[in-house]
Amino acid sequence: MAETKIIYHMDEEETPYLVKLPVAPERVTLADFKNVLSNRPVHAYKFFFKSMDQDFGVVKEEIFDDNAKLPCFNGRVVSWLVLAEGAHSDAGSQGTDSHTDLPPPLERTGGIGDSRPPSFHPNVASSRDGMDNETGTESMVSHRRERARRRNRDEAARTNGHPRGDRRRELGLPPDSASTVLSSELESSSFIDSDEEDNTSRLSSSTEQSTSSRLIRKHKCRRRKQRLRQTDRASSFSSITDSTMSLNIITVTLNMERHHFLGISIVGQSNDRGDGGIYIGSIMKGGAVAADGRIEPGDMLLQVNDVNFENMSNDDAVRVLREIVSQTGPISLTVAKCWDPTPRSYFTIPRADPVRPIDPAAWLSHTAALTGALPRYGTSPCSSAITRTSSSSLTSSVPGAPQLEEAPLTVKSDMSAIVRVMQLPDSGLEIRDRMWLKITIANAVIGADVVDWLYTHVEGFKERREARKYASSMLKHGFLRHTVNKITFSEQCYYVFGDLCSNLASLNLNSGSSGASDQDTLAPLPHPSVPWPLGQGYPYQYPGPPPCFPPAYQDPGFSYGSGSAGSQQSEGSKSSGSTRSSHRTPGREERRATGAGGSGSESDHTVPSGSGSTGWWERPVSQLSRGSSPRSQASAVAPGLPPLHPLTKAYAVVGGPPGGPPVRELAAVPPELTGSRQSFQKAMGNPCEFFVDIM
């Protein structure tokens, strides 16, 4: 004898009910359904049924004619009984408590296997519970009913009628319950004022459970308590809206003439409420699905050709799929896209992850950091005198310094720079923990992914084979490391990134030059046994310190030269600055005539004495031309301190250490070495005496 199964949801209750009518599905009417519900006040409810509309697809249709035929899907009728506005209070109490002893349904209904979007379900919490194997649903229902009875007896006045303190204790849930944690985080923003309850929905639009929230004021208090109980559950999911949980359903038509097999493996999900749907487990290379590229692991299979998998058991769905694949002709697959295209597991539940608010300021700063909109490296308020050109020179000459502008990656780029880009979070390379022989490899990559990334993101590779050779070179240079230290590169192996700091010892200032410029061409330091009075002029003119740095301090009682020079220095330091500035020696006059070629401007200089270090730097002609005498300039500083050195480009007196090789002026030094030394001086922030590369 034919029979019809009717599955109906009572108002706010989470567990649906199942009844069987001894009537054929095509002849069952609303009156037949109401006769089964004779122990319920059916006049107090509105009846909604799952129906199919040509324009909108699956909808909820209200039927109030007792003689109307009920819409049926696969031999089942799905209905929702919603308490009508203005219904008597007995209807609500009977609707929630009279059928608590009915057993739950045996078939899958409203779980994750249902192809309806989440907005179709009036009970979002119920539909979400089918996604995992949590067993706390029944205990949650019993706790809520017990709490409702306790509230009816003794509930004190509370803000918005919502308790904020002992939510976990009242629910009887452990402190680490994900749903209660999210509820406590979001409860302050999930409720509205209690006085505006009559015509206002208390739930967000994403849950769409506000149909029955408008009741007469006579029973508003009792209904508000029940509504708050449901809101506790709904607020746990209020952060998962339609934008993150709605099913993106696509239909893919595959031409099986070009490919010999479909190329997918499917898995079925089941829980204590029945089967939960068919999912794409993995995709095999060379198949029709892999060639199309739109279907990914984790997608839910809803329909194959004209056969709908809705409310179909997993065994039946697998049998139907095998029959269709064995036939010839194109195959159309209708799938619901998964929430995460690259899940760590095929069934990642979004509500298991905590939802945090977004800080716009942190978002913008992070975006600016990744796009390169950063302040200049190493700048400070006191170094504003350094121009952009010198700052760029510093950045380009010091290895490892961040570049001001992001340059495209090519095969000629530094390998360490390419590795740094590969390790960025948004580089496109999948870096995650992987399992190999029951060993967890942290932050590992697959060799094939590395080759694909290099071939896609680095310019200059004509073939993928060249990118593979480059990856092998990265392994040899230590930028990639195998788990067991294999030296041959394989695309099937897992690799981790090596320590970039291990290569810093081999870096020097001339890392970008080649040939003879890699060798030091400056004068070497003298032998330690050779006396070298540093009071002489420097062989090179180094730029002075920025204005923010104090002048170099010279101890008045310390001598760099011989004993006689030290006595002169001591006497000079005790005398006034004007006396010291007037000391001149015949040797200095000869050097001036020789170095300047008889220039008149050079004779106006005040040069440090050869016997005592009375001043560290040359004074420019511009200062003397303003009418300031050497006496007044020297007296402007304290005795024993060298005069302040302004930024100037005047050449120093050419001189070298005794016994050393001849030295050159700065103009005679090759340009690549000059820029490197000058940028090094700016980086150090203080004038240096001599700098020699240690090869």
UniProtKB/Swiss-Prot annotation:
Bias kind Polar residues: ranges: 622-635
Residue ranges of domain DIX in the record: 1-85
GO molecular function annotations of the record: beta-catenin binding; enzyme binding; frizzled binding; identical protein binding; protein kinase binding; small GTPase binding
One annotated Gene Ontology cellular component of this protein: dendritic spine
Superkingdom classification of source: Eukaryota
SMART domains (UniProt xref): DAX (SM00021), DEP (SM00049), PDZ (SM00228)
Domain DEP span(s) in chain numbering: 425-499
Low complexity bias locations: 177-192, 201-214, 551-580
Subcellular location, record wording: Cell membrane; Cytoplasm, Cytosol; Cytoplasmic vesicle
Compositional bias ranges of the Basic and acidic residues kind: 152-171
InterPro entries: DEP_dom, Dishevelled_C-dom, Dishevelled_fam, Dishevelled_protein_dom, DIX, DIX_dom_sf, Dsh/Dvl-rel, PDZ
Modification Phosphoserine, positions: 194
Comp. bias regions, Basic residues: 142-151, 215-228
Topology of this chain in the membrane: Peripheral membrane protein
Main location: membrane
Occurrences of domain PDZ (ranges): 251-323
UniProt similarity note: Belongs to the DSH family.
Binding partners and assembly: Interacts with BRD7 and INVS. Interacts (via PDZ domain) with the VANGL1 and VANGL2 (via C-terminus). Interacts (via PDZ domain) with NXN. Interacts with CXXC4. Interacts with ARRB1; the interaction is enhanced by phosphorylation of DVL1. Interacts with CYLD. Interacts (via PDZ domain) with RYK. Self-associates (via DIX domain) and forms higher homooligomers. Interacts (via PDZ domain) with DACT1 and FZD7, where DACT1 and FZD7 compete for the same binding site.
Name listed for the protein in its UniProt record: Segment polarity protein dishevelled homolog DVL-1
